[in-house]
UniProtKB/Swiss-Prot annotation:
GO cellular component: cytoplasm
Gene name tied to this protein: fabA
Catalytic activity, EC: 4.2.1.59, 5.3.3.14
Annotated metabolic or biological route of this protein: Lipid metabolism; fatty acid biosynthesis
Protein name from the UniProt record: 3-hydroxydecanoyl-[acyl-carrier-protein] dehydratase
Function comment: Necessary for the introduction of cis unsaturation into fatty acids. Catalyzes the dehydration of (3R)-3-hydroxydecanoyl-ACP to E-(2)-decenoyl-ACP and then its isomerization to Z-(3)-decenoyl-ACP. Can catalyze the dehydratase reaction for beta-hydroxyacyl-ACPs with saturated chain lengths up to 16:0, being most active on intermediate chain length.
UniProt GO molecular function: (3R)-hydroxyacyl-[acyl-carrier-protein] dehydratase activity; trans-2-decenoyl-acyl-carrier-protein isomerase activity
Pfam families referenced in this protein's UniProt entry, alphabetically: FabA
Organism for this UniProt entry: Ectopseudomonas mendocina (strain ymp) (Pseudomonas mendocina)
Compartments in which it is found: Cytoplasm
Record field: catalytic activity: a (3R)-hydroxyacyl-[ACP] = a (2E)-enoyl-[ACP] + H2O; (3R)-hydroxydecanoyl-[ACP] = (2E)-decenoyl-[ACP] + H2O; (2E)-decenoyl-[ACP] = (3Z)-decenoyl-[ACP]
Length: 171
């Protein structure tokens, strides 16, 4: 795989099918759980910690599946989907670095929600700041992240942790 610094929706769908990083390696979830339409920037340098960053986007429209069921008469994107998107991006970063294994979210430190995504919104932006990657017997990414809607930050998470596992038998 040739590393790029940006990825289209088609690239991300290929990743969900296991075609981007190779069989048995990091995959994004398929729609409807794929919470990213494009990665506009990915780099091993930069970010708040100087160790890498990812900027990704999700286009919002009122027909997205979660608005019809969360909540009836009060549609809002579930906050856990934004948190999951940040984990998805940390796992993508580890695969993009060339690390082997399947991604699993392993937790996070403090998570704060101080806004919401409504069906009238246009775009969600995810900003991931890599703090550390461990590439030994365990492949682990640790990052801080934020979610913004139409330019306004609405969620933050510290210490997002994702591991890559060549075997999940004992997981």
């Amino acid at each position: 795989m040739t590393r790029q610094n940006a990825y289209t929706r088609e690239d991300l769908l290929a990743c969900s099918r296991g075609e981007l990083f190779g069989p048995g390696n990091a995959q994004l979830p398929a729609p409807n759980m794929l919470m990213i339409d494009r990665i506009v920037h990915i780099s091993e340098t930069g970010g708040k910690h100087g160790k890498g960053e990812i900027v990704a986007e999700l286009d919002i429209n009122p027909d997205l599946w979660f608005f019809s069921c969360h909540f009836e008469g009060d549609p809002v994107m579930p906050g856990c989907l934004g948190l999951d998107a940040m984990w998805q991006l940390v796992g993508f970063y580890l695969g993009w670095q060339g690390n082997p294994g399947r991604g699993r979210a392993l937790g996070s430190g403090e998570v704060k929600f101080f806004g919401q995504v409504l069906p009238t919104a246009k775009k969600v932006t995810y900003n991931i700041h890599i703090k550390r990657t461990i590439n030994r017997s365990l492949i682990l990414g640790i990052a801080d992240g934020s979610v913004s809607v139409d330019g306004r930050e609405i969620y933050s998470a510290e210490g997002l942790r994702v591991g890559l596992f060549t075997s999940t038998d004992s997981f």
